[in-house]
Regions:
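Conserved catalytic motifs of ABC-family nucleotide-binding domains
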Residues: 161
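Short, charged/small-residue-rich alpha-helical element at the C-terminal edge
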Residues: 235-315
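Catalytic Walker B motif of ABC-type/P-loop ATPase nucleotide-binding domains
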Residues: 165-168
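Conserved ABC ATPase signature
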Residues: 140-144
Length: 335
């Protein structure tokens, strides 16, 4: 993950008031964000949130209906072909010809983009070294492991030296060890100067790799920032409690000064607190004890990107089909 705070160049991706609808359904609703050159930018959201639609507009698979957007300095409406020439794409699903060799895949892609012979062969050698597939260059892709296929797809996406590489769920379906190695390859690509636009359902992946993150839900960008900034919006610590009377406990605790927010869950509730949780906890326990409310479960932790994602999208609530009242976010007195 590169640090780009001192980067004074214009953003390499600019999205302003972008909207896209399918009939009467507005999939993307007036979103705006920027990505700086050299960043790893993660674009996160639940299924059906508008994430894929927004990305498909940026890579010119869908037309720009309303708003403004540019990629690598090229306007999506005026110069869609220039945009396509400036980007690389690695889709979620494997799209390799099973009977072609590793070398043939890259060779064909280079020819498709009219790369000169010498440049094409040199680039193939560079990329095979980058993704550590030099010894597999003459093997057919059907013999490769899942991780090797993903690395080959990344190499193919980099063949034309794109300014921006779009990675859609690059580690989905990979075992944990292979996922960690893939993170190293992604960082290596980024260190070569390629801006990366990443989508992932793995929050630890976004946390580890990203310089900046935006979360989209119901077609709108609900929050943007660094992973540290996003986690900090939830408070310093999170205290999860299960009690003999959760509703009464929430009513008693919601106005305590140290509590920023309370999230009610199916079996208990989480307290986002502004202070060190170990110092806040004794006061919380006193309140419950004085009200004769029995504490059955307690857990103290730092906010994670999973917590951020659930907080801002309510994904857990929608997935479980819970009643809306159980997913209310109650503002504490310390907000």
């Amino acid at each position: 993950m590169q640090q780009n705070e001192k980067n004074t160049e214009p953003p390499i991706i600019i999205v302003e008031n972008l909207e896209h609808a399918f009939g009467d359904f507005k999939a993307v609703d007036n979103i705006s964000f920027t990505v700086k050159k050299g960043q790893i930018f993660s674009f996160l959201g639940p299924n059906g949130a508008g994430k894929s639609t927004a990305i498909n507009v940026l890579i010119t698979l869908l037309s720009l209906q309303k708003g403004k957007a540019s990629v690598a300095g090229f306007d999506l409406k005026r110069d869609p072909q220039k945009v396509r020439e400036s980007i690389g794409i690695v889709f979620q699903d494997i799209t390799l010809d099973r009977d072609m060799t590793v070398w043939e895949i890259l060779e064909f892609h280079g020819r498709l983009y009219n790369m000169p012979d010498d440049e094409r062969r040199k680039r193939i050698d560079e990329l095979l070294e980058l993704v550590q597939l030099e010894t597999k260059r003459n093997e057919r892709t059907k013999s490769l492991s899942g991780g090797m296929k993903r690395r080959l797809e990344i190499a193919r996406g980099l063949m034309t030296r794109p300014k921006v590489l779009f990675l859609d769920e690059p580690t989905i379906g990979l075992d944990p060890q292979t996922r960690l190695r893939m993170w190293d390859y992604i960082k290596g690509v980024n260190n070569e100067g390629t801006t990366i636009f990443l989508t992932t359902h793995y929050m630890d992946e976004a946390d580890h790799l990203s310089d900046r993150i935006s979360i989209i839900d119901h077609g709108k960008v609900v929050i943007s920032g660094t992973s540290w900034e996003l986690k900090n919006t939830l408070g310093r610590d999170i205290i999860y409690l299960e009690t003999s009377d959760n509703d009464a406990a929430v009513r008693l605790l919601k106005d305590l000064p140290a509590i920023r927010t309370i999230k009610v869950k199916s079996r208990g509730f989480s307290l986002m607190v502004n202070e060190d949780g170990t110092k806040v906890l004794p006061g919380i326990l006193d309140v419950l004890r004085n009200a004769s409310i029995e504490l059955t479960t307690i857990n103290l932790k730092k906010p994670s990107m999973d917590d951020v994602f659930v907080f801002y999208t309510g994904k857990e609530i929608r997935d479980e089909g819970a009643a809306p009242a159980r997913g209310l976010f109650l503002r504490g007195g310390g907000r």
